[in-house]
Amino acid sequence: MSACNTFTEHVWKPGECKNCFKPKSLHQLPPDPEKAPITHGNVKTNANHSNNHRIRNTGNFRPPVAKKPTIAVKPTMIVADGQSICGELSIQEHCENKPVIIGWNRNRAALSQKPLNNNNEDDEGISHVPKPYGNNDSAKKMSDNNNGLTEVLKEIAGLDTAPQIRGNETNSRETFLGRINDCYKRSLERKLPPSCMIGGIKETQGKHVILSGSTEVISNEGGRFCYPEFSSGEESEEDVLFSNMEEEHESWDESDEELLAMEIRMRGQPRFANFRANTLSPVRFFVDKKWNTIPLRNKSLQRICAVDYDDSYDEILNGYEENSVVSYGQGSIQSMVSSDSTSPDSSLTEESRSETASSLSQKICNGGLSPGNPGDSKDMKEIEPNYESPSSNNQDKDSSQASKSSIKVPETHKAVLALRLEEKDGKIAVQTEKEESKASTDVAGQAVTINLVPTEEQAKPYRVVNLEQPLCKPYTVVDVSAAMASEHLEGPVNSPKTKSSSSTPNSPVTSSSLTPGQISAHFQKSSAIRYQEVWTSSTSPRQKIPKVELITSGTGPNVPPRKNCHKSAPTSPTATNISSKTIPVKSPNLSEIKFNSYNNAGMPPFPIIIHDEPTYARSSKNAIKVPIVINPNAYDNLAIYKSFLGTSGELSVKEKTTSVISHTYEEIETESKVPDNTTSKTTDCLQTKGFSNSTEHKRGSVAQKVQEFNNCLNRGQSSPQRSYSSSHSSPAKIQRATQEPVAKIEGTQESQMVGSSSTREKASTVLSQIVASIQPPQSPPETPQSGPKACSVEELYAIPPDADVAKSTPKSTPVRPKSLFTSQPSGEAEAPQTTDSPTTKVQKDPSIKPVTPSPSKLVTSPQSEPPAPFPPPRSTSSPYHAGNLLQRHFTNWTKPTSPTRSTEAESVLHSEGSRRAADAKPKRWISFKSFFRRRKTDEEDDKEKEREKGKLVGLDGTVIHMLPPPPVQRHHWFTEAKGESSEKPAIVFMYRCDPAQGQLSVDQSKARTDQAAVMEKGRAENALLQDSEKKRSHSSPSQIPKKILSHMTHEVTEDFSPRDPRTVVGKQDGRGCTSVTTALSLPELEREDGKEDISDPMDPNPCSATYSNLGQSRAAMIPPKQPRQPKGAVDDAIAFGGKTDQEAPNASQPTPPPLPKKMIIRANTEPISKDLQKSMESSLCVMANPTYDIDPNWDASSAGSSISYELKGLDIESYDSLERPLRKERPVPSAANSISSLTTLSIKDRFSNSMESLSSRRGPSCRQGRGIQKPQRQALYRGLENREEVVGKIRSLHTDALKKLAVKCEDLFMAGQKDQLRFGVDSWSDFRLTSDKPCCEAGDAVYYTASYAKDPLNNYAVKICKSKAKESQQYYHSLAVRQSLAVHFNIQQDCGHFLAEVPNRLLPWEDPDDPEKDEDDMEETEEDAKGETDGKNPKPCSEAASSQKENQGVMSKKQRSHVVVITREVPCLTVADFVRDSLAQHGKSPDLYERQVCLLLLQLCSGLEHLKPYHVTHCDLRLENLLLVHYQPGGTAQGFGPAEPSPTSSYPTRLIVSNFSQAKQKSHLVDPEILRDQSRLAPEIITATQYKKCDEFQTGILIYEMLHLPNPFDENPELKEREYTRADLPRIPFRSPYSRGLQQLASCLLNPNPSERILISDAKGILQCLLWGPREDLFQTFTACPSLVQRNTLLQNWLDIKRTLLMIKFAEKSLDREGGISLEDWLCAQYLAFATTDSLSCIVKILQHR
């Protein structure tokens, strides 16, 4: 077919299928039309269909959302369709419903090569199938309710009985795959209950978990593939549970199938390698822990991690519900499935549901039941009911285990994590491991019967934490099973705790429904209720809104729907509340969310679409979107994972949850749900709200749920999901507050937990709501709810203000404080959820306690706390700010005038408390200044505390997270800066005037016009500052600063003072001001778009040029568009020509001496003034952009590096760069190592000081020698009579001394450079351009000399990258590569990088675009940059003039966003310049020139050799990418200038390798895109062997070019086209003694055969030999020597003489104070000190034979 069977919306192309790029209309999913009715929609493939379906059939199931952008791959439902599998084993008609269970049974039984009870179960399953089938019928009816679309989907998915036919094929892989495919398709759209699960539950007891086809349980602890060991003992529990489940969920099969399929499709899930009881362990988790954290490996597992809950999934869930299938009514079953899936519950749940899920759920339900047992649908039913009902026992058990707070909810471990679906022994084992879970299902014989703890609660959703910092940091794996358990829990409405489905021991099927009828309803709606996890940060793509109607609508017994769909696991698709269907909130948001700027969906570090399909998918291409839930701080992956993990890895504590939640996503929506759950902790309560809650839970993204769930798990089991939703639905929540039904819909969009309205909202409504909710992510996270600024935010918050107040006040207060869930909603969802239900409200913020007050605040303090201008809903979502923002924003809620988001964020922030507040601040929003000011946005107290602490909040995700994307960042510099989430911090390269304070005020007033703009504006600078801080603490101020930063760069200091609001603010108060600026910056930034002119405050430093560091977070995340000005914003600005605001505030001293406590130690924080720092910290410093680098440790992505640096910078340590080293106090080269700058070569006194001068150096040697002599004097003087012995001693003494001298030389030349500096945004203000003329223009950047106030003795270079900000990802890649390397003399160091608005006059290469080529023009541009930049306070000092010039320019036009880097090495020219300028010299004195070339090549080889251990290949070695730094004997870096292109051989020039933008690094951090295609790549490509000797080859070309010869391959392109030999290479004229050696070296390096090409280390040896090694005479003698001994003696004697001569040279130089050691001396010492006879002979041979 032209169109694939299943329509998966393309992340980047909304209307098109990601698989076939055809419009949705063409995707009819023709196969199995009969099934379609059963299947709600293809879980994955039919995502769009399902979306439509859902939309149409709002009643039956949530309208399909465009497509939930979920981190998890859409499970390729094992199309084993429980049907096929079940059908085979049992009636295939029932396959739809029981397929999952049966599928398992079939996989185990039908496919059972292992007899396990699968066959019996199969029979039973078959017998049971009819029930499920009945359920299926009901499901079909439900589908009918849904619309013809459902039917179509079913057909496409083959949900009909048709798949049952395949049941007979059980044994054949094809059949198996066919069944799975059917199941898979059905599961995509299915609504049928997983009959397989129902059928196979009976024999669960006695079954053991089967790993890799083996029956033995790996361990309870959980290994990579570990399943709960309760296989026997627990199995019985599971049996009971399964029985209960069976009774209740006859629909489990579908769910199971889906889950199974999903799981299978997430093949490679095994990546949850280290599953632990509380981590990824399939083992039963502690009851109190809601989420299991699964460390995500870098592997595909990650995709599994977040199940891509498509609308189709929701539909499936809905379908199940319709079918009365207890599809995941029992949370346990679902949790089982989830476990299977290992990845987020949803995915597994869906997939598993269809197939794996069925067996898995069976297992889970069966507990002890082996997957084989799942075959019996009866058993399943029985167990299920038991699970549900008895589940109360089991659940209680599990519950107690699973959730401490919630009623005992059987915590079914999501053993699924490690499950492998395999058709081994006829068993279908979910193979989580395999990426192609589907294929693996049938392929691997491993029947991983994961005996999930029979707990209905099921395993907590796994929060997959990527231990390895996978590229897709945002991936959060949530265990669907937890969600299922949640559903199960929901079932037991009796239990107050939603989470613990088991909470309702009464209800036979906890998850399904309390009564059998309920169970039927459950079957019908249970699945429908399943919430779809949205793996998007701010919004849960599928807001599950339980529909009361769903409860009754079920064809099966119209049992009162489980109103409490306690989605234990936010991700679990469990239709916990049969009544609440997961209503995919169909909103542009969902579809967009997957891949929108806020999500970063599809942004580089995250693999967005996973194409792998299980074989059974059978080309029903269900593209798996793996848009990672992109939290605003998703890029801060570390923060996200931390948030998921929580401090303990489980967000058990509310605070933890909140913090985590905030960090993670806006998925805090879950919180909202949790609050609902919490509020109506009782199941009944939940039931009342159950639909909404349940739906809400569903709605919550998996990730959110995970966060919330983890957090909530400890708090209250029922709440977690809600909590999760809460984040998402924060905006929705607000709306909910306003109108519960509407709110619910909105909530649905924002967070499924908003399901409070018992009826489902229309998909369109939900979608619109979702859209609204999703858009908020645009606004700064901090004030997510504050204002309608974010597109969605406005919508969401439009109602929310009231709703928020209502919800905050009514529900927030009581529940939130206590329950984890309460806190969780802290995200965007918080407000809306709060609205939804008091609990939800309360839960809005994990620390909702503040939220509770928040309602009052909302009403009372809306003014005082103007919400951030545009706190993006996402910002709310970002867990960090969620707490504080919620607090603040709740306060602001009353004042809906401003961005509502602010309130929401405030609530979130508040809930989190100071830490959360800080975290809540979206780091991304931060402009450099904003960054700092933003901090102030946190609670002022928190701010103050943090400020005092001097910490931004650590990478742990406490305070620093800037996750929330900036709303609409219209700032110039942010516009580009935020180009990609992967981008690193951005700085605005601006010239700002000191009047910044005034500007800030103005900006603030503007920004606050909506909010408290007037307050801030009206206030005196101090008052303003304070207010700003307070507001900031509320997160609105921080937002304002962002905006200001971004848009208000206020006019250039001179002309555009108004444009430098940020500058002004920062400057005004210095510290407080900055904070104000930050606070203002966001709002202002927003307003600034319209009011940029308004920012009238004059730039404090009219002609100051400053770099503003938007902060990695900004750059990294899309939110960076509206960078906040952290308190250090001004500080951030690098003053190119003027003072930075910070400086002005600090002491108005040229150098802002008083850094915040951070000091250099922060590596770049030092520049920040303490107050600013405090404010930054207190505001939680949006500064650190988790996106970039939650932790310096994240090497996973370049983003990490930027993040870390910004994050760190903001953090107590300014982690300026990716690395943590920032903490070192050394960050700033201090006078201590005056040599700290590279120039230290022979740094004047420093050189001598550091080296103790040559003499001191010699002294040390002598001293060492003496030291040796004193203790060993006797030894030394022994054997004086023996000449040979004495010679040996002298030889060894010389060798040792030379080694020490070589090390000393390294210390001398690397003085101060061994410590990696990390300048954070706070340090920018301490930099000033010492000249407006570039000192060097390289291939990738232009360099300007700059001085650093804190290290006046050393010069620094400001590197302005030529690539546009949009292309800055390239630089970040380069940065990530470089930061993975240790410091090296010949590798350029990045001491700080930012995205900045750079005046065109500083961009010589911009000439073509801008008429201003001249310096003046550039200056004008610079002016513009200043004005336009988010007001960095340029340093007025030396830069004043240039600043002024810049100011003169038109800031808007002439500024461009570029990555600006601070480096220690000030290049004077490139090797290209050197070669060009040395043409004449080469002719005059070829010896000297070619020796110089050898020295440069030696340094190049030394640098390249340094890359090898790190598996880095530069791949772009060009003359223009090699920089030269001249060192004179004085030790000072020589001024640049081609005038002396070639330094004398005595003082060789230092060569630095730069521009790693094309570098290749072979590591586990492989681009997901590449990984995805590896299956089709040749080994040499996968292993990157083609790059292994690329640098060697390019070095060979450089030899020609440096000798003024053309590139042989440019001159003779045919050389490469044919198989050339070394003899074909052009000859190098022999002009000097070095020419012949260089010819040989070039031919060796250009060997066409890579395997024969010499290594760079050999090339280095050859160059050393050419420079200082044996000459021809020695070679001849060497050749004449017949024996090896003689040759070695010859070489040894030569070495001894050379070493002695070098020692003499060192001795002489020590007396020559003026001369000092030269670079050549050092290089020679390195050579002679470490040369050996072997190494020498090897090189001699190469030279002789080549």
UniProtKB/Swiss-Prot annotation:
Subunit note: Homodimer. Interacts with BCAR1 and CRK. Interacts with PRAG1. Interacts (when phosphorylated at Tyr-1188) with SHC1 (via PID domain). Found in a complex with PPP1CA, PPP1CC, SHC1 and PEAK1. Interacts (when phosphorylated at Tyr-635) with tensin TNS3 (when phosphorylated on the SH2 domain); TNS3 also interacts with integrins ITGB1, ITGB3 and ITGB5 and mediates their association with PEAK1. Interacts with RASAL2 and GRB2.
UniProt protein name: Inactive tyrosine-protein kinase PEAK1
Impact noted for substituting P1145L: In a metastatic melanoma sample; somatic mutation
Residue ranges with Polar residues bias: 355-364, 675-694, 748-758, 820-841, 889-902, 1440-1450
Positions of modified residues (Phosphothreonine): T1151
Stated family: Belongs to the protein kinase superfamily.
Phosphoprotein in keyword set: yes
Record carries keyword Amino-acid biosynthesis: no
Localisation per UniProt entry: Cytoplasm, Cytoskeleton; Cell junction, Focal adhesion
Impact upon substituting S1035F: In a metastatic melanoma sample; somatic mutation
Effect of Y635F: Impairs interaction with tensin TNS3 and association with integrin ITGB1. 50% reduction in interaction with GRB2. No effect on interaction with unphosphorylated SHC1 but reduces interaction with tyrosine-phosphorylated SHC1
Ranges of compositional bias, category Pro residues: 864-874
Gene Ontology biological process terms in this record: cell migration; focal adhesion assembly; protein autophosphorylation; regulation of cell motility; regulation of focal adhesion assembly; substrate adhesion-dependent cell spreading
Role, per record: Probable catalytically inactive kinase. Scaffolding protein that regulates the cytoskeleton to control cell spreading and migration by modulating focal adhesion dynamics. Acts as a scaffold for mediating EGFR signaling.
Organism, scientific name: Homo sapiens
Domain notes: The dimerization region encompasses helices both from the N- and C-terminal of the protein kinase domain.
Keywords: Cell junction, Cytoplasm, Cytoskeleton, Phosphoprotein
Coiled-coil region list: none
UniProt feature, compositional bias: Acidic residues: 1406-1423
Entry-annotated residues carrying Phosphotyrosine: Y635, Y641, Y665, Y1188
Effect of H611Q: In a bladder carcinoma NOS sample; somatic mutation
Annotated gene: PEAK1
Gene Ontology cellular component terms for the protein in this record: actin cytoskeleton; cytosol; focal adhesion
Residues recorded with modification Phosphoserine: S281, S540, S572, S587, S648, S826, S854, S898, S1374
UniProt GO molecular function: identical protein binding; non-membrane spanning protein tyrosine kinase activity; protein kinase activity
